[in-house]
């Protein structure tokens, strides 16, 4: 087992101390107030149905004031689909912003008023041509860039999928079922870089280890 998964398993505690009432590590809001940044206002720069870009006027605790760009994005759902052979469903795609070809888990935006788990399943089918065999299970919701953006990402997990057709031609033309241990090595080699995909693969790998 790779070092990444060993580290993940070692820290994978469902009842984390930070979430236990009265436990060490929990600090009250009143104690944190002196370090809280002040927000004086936020003005819109541009927006579309998926992303809102604005400039916020903020102040540091010691008094310095400045402006910072803020990105607010619609919620996304990403799914780790695994099979009974210990493989995960990945798609090969080009990301023009970083100008790289990378392997990713299927995922995308959750439409307004859409059930997030249903959106996760829809994205899997649209992007890969595989339909999840069950309703995807929500693993966690995380924020990948809280220093300058609000971009909630839901990570889902499901075992089994049925092949129902070809993926959307605008998404990818290369789909692969990759052994989880190989996927972990791809992360270590930098072939998988997306936050949701990295977390999803390591989570699936930890579940695989937990069952063994």
Describe every region a protein language model picked out.
Residues 2-11:
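Single-pass alpha-helical transmembrane signal-anchor segments in small membrane proteins across taxa
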Residues 10-37, 64, 101, 112, ...:
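Nudix hydrolase/Nudix homology domain
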Residues 44-49, 96, 141-153, 209:
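Acidic pyrophosphate-coordinating catalytic loop
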Residues 40-78, 84:
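Acidic, metal-coordinating catalytic segment for phosphate/diphosphate chemistry
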Residues 66, 73-78, 83, 108-196:
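Unchanged
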Residues 36-45, 135-137:
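Short secondary-structure junctions
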